[in-house]
């Protein structure tokens, strides 16, 4: 919780204090989000990425999350009751304005939870960090995670290895003379396995941090 200095009122944020949580129990919030979608659709945007969308507050604040090793374990503020119904309305509204590709980042490493948010009526694809955030070059583990994803998800999986939230792929996977070979191997995997590839700007050049 933070206090807003001009009003003296408190506001809630799950992440950075600049990222104020919205109260999705309030119908006016939902309507305002629809107006934001209208703004961008009118300018030709044909897709949206919804960040940590399973953290929407649709069932109130609830009790405090438990603490593990000094960090909160998100338990009561994630995958709340009502969130799927809220997202169904959101996705339905977006598609009523014309075709759009909907991408969700889900704050979970459990494939069954990821699968809840992906369907023809919900998100087209969901990010799977089990694949994308691996810290070392381990082909057998990469293939194992990809196979598990292919079996679990009914829709298309996502394939990415870098993002703004993590070090670049080659900075994690490379080892001097092996940098180029490993970059080629991972990109070949990314572009040939069934799924939707996401290439982070600079990856096509083998860029490092």
Report residues per predicted region.
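Active-site and adjacent substrate-binding regions of carbohydrate-active enzymes
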Residues: 1-209
């Amino acid at each position: 919780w933070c206090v807003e200095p001009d009003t003296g009122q408190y506001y809630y944020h799950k992440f950075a204090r600049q990222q104020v949580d919205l109260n999705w129990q309030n119908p006016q919030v939902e309507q305002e989000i629809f107006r934001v979608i209208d703004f961008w659709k009118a300018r030709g945007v044909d897709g949206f990425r919804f960040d940590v969308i399973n953290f929407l507050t649709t069932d109130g604040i609830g009790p405090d999350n438990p603490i593990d090793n000094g960090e909160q374990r998100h338990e009561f503020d994630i995958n709340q009751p009502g969130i799927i119904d809220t997202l169904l309305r959101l996705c339905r509204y977006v598609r009523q304005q014309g075709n759009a590709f909907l991408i969700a980042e889900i704050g979970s490493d459990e494939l069954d939870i990821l699968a809840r948010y992906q369907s023809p009526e919900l998100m087209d694809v969901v990010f799977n960090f089990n694949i994308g955030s691996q810290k070392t070059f381990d082909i057998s583990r990469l293939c194992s995670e990809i196979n598990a994803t292919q079996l679990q998800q009914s829709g298309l999986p996502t394939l990415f290895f870098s993002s703004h939230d993590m070090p670049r792929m080659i900075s994690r996977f490379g080892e001097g003379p092996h940098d180029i070979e490993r970059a080629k191997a991972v990109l070949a995997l990314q572009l040939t396995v069934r799924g939707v590839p996401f290439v982070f700007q600079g990856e096509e050049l083998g860029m490092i941090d």
